[in-house]
Amino acid sequence: MPSNLGCSGAWNLIIKSFMKAPYWIISNHDVMYEPGFLQEMNEKAQDPETGVVHGKGGGWDIFLLKDWMVQRYGLFDENLYPGYCEDMDYGMRFIHDDVKRVLSLDHGYYHGTKKDDYSDGSQTWRSEPAIAQGVHLAHEMNKRYLHMKWSEAWQSHIEGETYKTPFDLDDMPVSFTTYDLDFVRRKHLGF
């Protein structure tokens, strides 16, 4: 197994490793939960019509994904390597459908907020200019990939202006992803 699967690859590995689970809670590594947060997330997941439970504001830094969502919309696109935009890509798959989402919970969590000695985010790439440059480049390339896949309107999530299928191909299922090794290699740049 490579040393860095990337965000999508890691999330897919979680899903594939626990195939019998009714849902998966996927969280950024630097999220801290307040007491009761995960219990509330579990309670919201009991509604069979709910497809995704977000921590707050519809964000993807901590989310619960139901098994029927993966059956209908597939796994995460591993071309979005090493990270960034994989959540937006997944959201674009069901933007034209009536998927029930819980956008915020009453219990909180911390991500990107200082609390005591907590420091958010990966400190490695922030302290290493060469790694930071590679992360920035990969982020920009991932955004361009999403422009091709969903149209330039993907960033604003405007329903009527985005493609209904990947790459605007009518016969393409929304769950379509293919692993393009050359595309990923071009972005690898030391990751």
List where the protein language model places each region.
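Conserved donor NDP-sugar-binding/catalytic core segment of glycosyltransferases
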Residues: 31-62, 68
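Alpha-helical elements of Rossmann-like donor-binding domains used by nucleotide-donor carbohydrate transfer enzymes
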Residues: 9, 13, 36-43, 89-93, ...
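Conserved donor nucleotide-binding strand/loop of the catalytic core
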Residues: 1-5
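Conserved nucleotide-sugar donor-binding catalytic segment
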Residues: 59, 64-65, 75-80
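Short beta-strand-to-loop acidic/aromatic patch adjacent to the donor-nucleotide binding site
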Residues: 21-32
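C-terminal catalytic/acceptor-binding lobe
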Residues: 91-191
